[in-house]
Amino acid sequence: MEILMHEMSNGQETSTVDTKIYTINKQSTKKIENTQIKDEERLMKTDLMDTIDIVFENITYTVSLGCRKGQKEILHGINGRLPAKHLIALMGPSGAGKSTLLNILSGFRTTGVDGNININGHAREINSFRKCSAYITQDDRLEALLTVNENMTVAADLKLPTSTPRYEKEAIIEEILTILGLREHMNTQTGRLSGGQKKRLSIALELVNNPTVMFLDEPTTGLDSLSCTQVINLLKLLARQGRTIICTIHQPSATIFQLFDLVYILSKGECLFHGSTDHLVSYLENIKLPCPVYYNPADYVIELACGEYGEDKISLLVSAAENGKNLQWFKNSNTLLESNGLKTLHSHKNLNINNRNSLQATPVIHQIKILMKRGFLMCKRDTTLTHLRILANIAVGLMLGLVFLESGTDGARVLSNYNLLFSILIHHMMTTMMLTVVTFPMQMNILLKEHFNRWYSLKAFYTALSLVDLPLSIFCCLIFTLLVYFITSQPLEMSRFLMFFSISLLVVLISQGFGLMIGAICNVIPIFVKF
């Protein structure tokens, strides 16, 4: 694994930024050095009673096509066994159902699903299972303005109990980054990392709380061959330490394919093969579909799954695999425990996943504090939007003030005052709402990933988002109110001015809430991407 400990000399250029908010002081460093080795080993390893075997039976998934078109079945009664300490690939052509199955197993998708999913012989309790698992998406959903160390610190503060000492959190971060080969980039902004480094950082963030099961959607997409090998080797190492690692992959090279322990091949929602990668060639020979000499078995089986050799071959493969029930192609298949054996080995008493406390590891107040800290830091580093908001309020305030110049002192211009108030209302509503509608969807992907992986609750995120934006909203509203109020010669009474300002601020805050709602429902980002 030396390749994971050193970066390529010709990698992308990196730069460092100010990290005053998240720094490791000398006292903490001394404590890290004195931390016992046993504690560090405990971080990256799971014992026998913590390992998780996943068994799914007769899984079907249907989607609605509308009132007139009825429903369509995506997965057709598939079965499978995903044992612990294995790196498992869900493989198949586009549209085979790989990502759908991954989402169902992880609990990311629950509606329209039928069948049984058992964890260590017991029926899966979705909220309990989520506490010991992590889901890593295909695209790297990271805060680009934060450094590697800052991202890791936020993850540690949110995912580890508040009783965990700071020096222990720093020891965990340092160990993970060292193992993943990111330690020398701790002070590098995430946006300046290479694709492989971002993928490893995505994995590192979820390793903070040491999950037992990890789901990864297309972890090698967009990476070069060396980065692919680094990522898969890393996943294999994590699996050897006791985790169950499940990832989708489209069409791996022969080298990458051999790194997987088990492969689950799908085609049109059915299982074609379920077993060891070493036994795939033997399986194909056994059903009279031998892989040509010097041919990548992964390429050949994908061609079979696509129907290039006829639809009858797909039916033959599904029949031979018994739609996932046939486990004879596992290594040491005779030693696999049945459901009763798994129940005995992993009793409810010893399973961490049956803890039904809150999904998040920290209280809501602590989550709000950490999210506000992150939000203010990002605002500090990206001042473009802040400057634009201030300039927009100054420009519109001057324009309205000049249009309705001294209308407040002229009794004959009551209608002009009404028009002024209406214009102010429209300005506060539209500028605030449209700004939120456009910018909030950019945060949605990160929100979905972090919330599903139990970093924080939705109420904590909304509260922190509102509080971070509140000082700027007050400042912009105050500037606008001062310009309009005095240029239009409104009555110079403190009570009237405070009432005018308070109502304006309330309109701004309400508009921001509506903007968040509309931005969450109607994601406008794809529209801008098209144009």
Give the ranges of each region predicted by the language model.
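Topological signature of polytopic alpha-helical transporters
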Residues: 1-79, 84, 93, 119, ...
